[in-house]
Amino acid sequence: MAIVKCKPTSAGRRHVVKVVNAELHKGKPYAPLLDSKSKTGGRNNLGRITTRHIGGGHKQHYRLVDFKRNKLDIPAVVERLEYDPNRSANIALVLYKDGERRYILAPKGLSVGDTIQAGVSAPIKAGNALPMRNIPVGTTVHNVELKPGKGGQIARSAGAYVQIIAREGNYVTLRLRSGEMRKVLAECTATIGEVGNSEHMLRVLGKAGANRWRGVRPTVRGTAMNPVDHPHGGGEGRNFGKHPVTPWGVQTKGKKTRHNKRTDKYIVRRRGK
């Protein structure tokens, strides 16, 4: 993997920093594991905008990634590593001994030809998935389930990982990258190692158009709007003089947004500042 800084041959190239991975497959993805993906433009079934700043962008196919890792005790060989436009991490196409192919998240250090396995008896090495009751304390894991059999939900983006710091009864305690410590059922499955492509955070798009290719539209400041459009709008010149809020009047600085009291008991320590 290489970090490439583009030459300033134009204003749009001047600040571009690319992450180039020569190991990635250059051909087409594996067709049976593709699904169609339609653009919504951030609108719901009524045609109303429910998520701002979404629209346009390159057409994409969704890759059916195996987050459950429920093909147990059958070894698989990594056929190739691929780019996935739907996530920051790369994915790996693996071929199981029974002939089935699946996509999985590509962990750090996984290469073409490596063997992976899921199940209670799987060895502790990158890419193998097993219940957390069978994983030693102190191990770094990713693609962690919150409910047994539901599929991984925690630590799935590029460079992400979670550390198992304790095991007590039916629960294990995890330390997340945010600093939060939470309990999860020990029966939940996790994959050993951290997600690959950690250099993703070093890339620089360099121009607004690169964001438009990704389907991201501009964000207009509230103070640049009219009073009818935003609480910050209007006034002669740059008037503000109030606490910053969202377009719907909700405070933006420091207001707590979590409303899931049912699972509060599983959080041992809140994330750090």
From Swiss-Prot:
Answer whether the UniProt record assigns the keyword Ribosomal protein to this protein: yes
Query: Which keywords does the record carry?
Result: Ribonucleoprotein, Ribosomal protein, RNA-binding, rRNA-binding
Which stretches are tagged as biased composition: Basic residues?
A: 253-273
Region Disordered: which residues? 31-50, 221-273
**Superkingdom of the source species:** Bacteria
What Gene3D superfamilies does this protein's entry cite? 2.30.30.30, Nucleic acid-binding proteins (2.40.50.140), Ribosomal protein L2, domain 3 (4.10.950.10)
A cellular component term from Gene Ontology for this protein is:
large ribosomal subunit
* Gene Ontology molecular functions: rRNA binding; structural constituent of ribosome; transferase activity
Which Pfam families would you find in this protein's record?
Ribosomal_L2, Ribosomal_L2_C
Q: What processes does the entry annotate via GO biological process terms? A: cytoplasmic translation
Tell me yes or no: is Ribosomal protein among this UniProt entry's keywords. Answer: yes
Q: Could you tell me what this protein does?
A: One of the primary rRNA binding proteins. Required for association of the 30S and 50S subunits to form the 70S ribosome, for tRNA binding and peptide bond formation. It has been suggested to have peptidyltransferase activity; this is somewhat controversial. Makes several contacts with the 16S rRNA in the 70S ribosome.
The entry assigns this protein to a family as follows: Belongs to the universal ribosomal protein uL2 family.
Subunit record text = Part of the 50S ribosomal subunit. Forms a bridge to the 30S subunit in the 70S ribosome.
What is the name attached to this protein's record?
Large ribosomal subunit protein uL2
Which gene name belongs to this protein?
rplB
